[in-house]
């Protein structure tokens, strides 16, 4: 990597694997006569559905080169991973063997659905599978323009500034941004400990990115060593081991991670700017969430993030304006990969994209330990990116 360049890496829904090294599982299969195919498949779908292998085609068809006849092979059911005995087939499946002249054997099929055409081509060499390219198009998955990259890097600089300025030890920081107008909606740091007094979250200010002058980067994360103990997402249970000032117990809370506080700040802002409850979105009438939905509209200036603007946002709103629904369409920038709790909170808030600088190898929820963006059962999915901060770029920021 160029030591003077910022690099933005997409973190996919599942770990990257070589197309020719796909995980497989064992299944019982058998050649079948074409005239029995429909009947056998109908029985198998009832008694042995392949719920976890929906990407795998139940029947494999092959044209025999010698005679041109069609050869059909059907998956009967899953097989035990550590046992190759045909007698372990479920009784309901075994009852199909004699009537339909089956000859069961054990073979392999790919465990996961392909996420690229290259993976699908390799999978089909083992057993035919289905491939469904993503139907959504989140900005950035296919790469960023130079202008977008600069904007992302500037917001990440705000995160670094917040994390290192006035905090000993280092804390995590979160900045929620409306990408449609490149404005900061909320910016907060960890408030798990009493030393991190909560900020006033009733301000109606929504501000564009501003140059913040010198950023005090005394050291990179790699050199912080023991100073990482206060990063709430890195050590979710560390708070329980620390002494707390009971007289100021209202100033700390074990769940006040940077992401959670930023969400609270964004909500307080919305309540202040859109006080009329009749204009609030009815959750029952919100359109289905999808990852390419536009950022929710705000009454904000569309100025460039480089333009200085110290004025507060107008608190008097057009009566026709409706209160936005949560954080739909927003981006969030974090110093550290969020823990599972914070990652799930960002799902509920309908965040569109997450950018973080450093992986969370102990409790990360977006790639390092868990991978929440790949959980199919969730009703919303965001795109996740890691922003690599080379040392040269960090040193350059200290001289702005």
UniProtKB/Swiss-Prot annotation:
Could you tell me which InterPro entries the record lists for this protein?
Cytidine_deaminase-like
The entry's localization annotation reads:
Nucleus; Cytoplasm
Gene3D superfamilies named among the record's database cross-references: Cytidine Deaminase, domain 2
- Keyword Cytoplasm tagged: yes
Keywords assigned by UniProt, alphabetized? Cytoplasm, Hydrolase, Metal-binding, Nucleus, tRNA processing, Zinc
* GO molecular-function term, one example from the UniProt record: tRNA-specific adenosine-34 deaminase activity
Which residue ranges does the record assign to the CMP/dCMP-type deaminase domain? Answer: 250-385
For whether the record's keyword set contains Aminoacyl-tRNA synthetase, the answer is no
Main location class: nucleus
What the record says about disrupting the gene is: Embryonic lethality due to embryo development arrest at the globular stage.
Q: Which family does it belong to?
A: Belongs to the cytidine and deoxycytidylate deaminase family. ADAT3 subfamily.
Q: Which protein is depicted?
A: tRNA-specific adenosine deaminase TAD3
Question: Which species expresses this protein natively?
Answer: Arabidopsis thaliana
């Amino acid at each position: 990597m160029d030591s003077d360049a910022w690099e933005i890496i997409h973190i996919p829904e599942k770990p990257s694997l070589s197309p020719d090294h796909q995980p497989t599982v064992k299944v019982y299969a058998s050649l079948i006569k074409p005239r029995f195919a429909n009947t056998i498949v109908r029985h198998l779908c009832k008694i042995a559905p392949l719920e976890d292998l929906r990407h795998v085609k139940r029947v494999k068809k092959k044209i025999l080169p010698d005679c041109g006849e069609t050869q059909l092979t059907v998956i009967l059911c899953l097989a035990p991973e550590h046992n190759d005995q045909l007698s372990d087939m479920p009784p309901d499946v075994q009852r199909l063997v004699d009537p339909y002249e089956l000859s069961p054997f054990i073979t392999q099929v790919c465990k996961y659905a392909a996420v690229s055409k290259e993976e699908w081509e390799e999978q089909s060499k083992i057993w035919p599978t289905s491939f469904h390219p993503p139907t959504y198009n989140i900005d950035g998955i296919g790469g960023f323009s130079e202008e977008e990259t600069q904007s992302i890097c500037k917001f990440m600089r705000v995160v670094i500034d917040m994390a290192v300025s006035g905090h000993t030890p280092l804390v995590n920081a979160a900045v929620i941004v409306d990408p449609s107008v490149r404005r900061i909606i909320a910016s907060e740091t960890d408030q798990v400990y009493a030393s991190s007094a909560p900020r006033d979250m009733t301000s109606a200010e929504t501000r564009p990115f501003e140059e913040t002058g010198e950023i005090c980067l005394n050291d990179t994360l790699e050199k912080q060593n023991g100073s990482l103990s206060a990063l709430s997402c890195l050590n979710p249970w560390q708070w329980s081991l620390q002494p707390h000032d009971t007289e100021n117990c209202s100033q700390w809370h074990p769940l006040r991670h940077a992401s959670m506080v930023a969400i609270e700040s964004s909500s307080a802002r919305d309540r202040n700017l859109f006080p009329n409850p009749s204009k609030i979105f009815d959750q029952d009438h919100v359109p289905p969430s999808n990852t390419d939905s536009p950022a929710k509209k705000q009454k904000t200036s569309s100025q460039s993030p480089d333009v200085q603007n110290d004025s507060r946002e107008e608190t008097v709103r057009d009566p026709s304006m409706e209160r936005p629904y949560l954080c739909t369409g927003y981006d969030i920038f974090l110093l550290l990969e969020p823990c599972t709790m914070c990652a799930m909170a960002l799902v509920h808030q309908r965040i569109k994209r997450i950018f973080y600088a450093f992986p969370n190898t102990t409790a990360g929820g977006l790639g390092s330990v868990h991978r929440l963006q790949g959980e199919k059962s969730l009703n919303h999915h965001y795109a996740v990116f890691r922003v690599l901060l080379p040392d040269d770029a960090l040193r350059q920021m200290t001289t702005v």
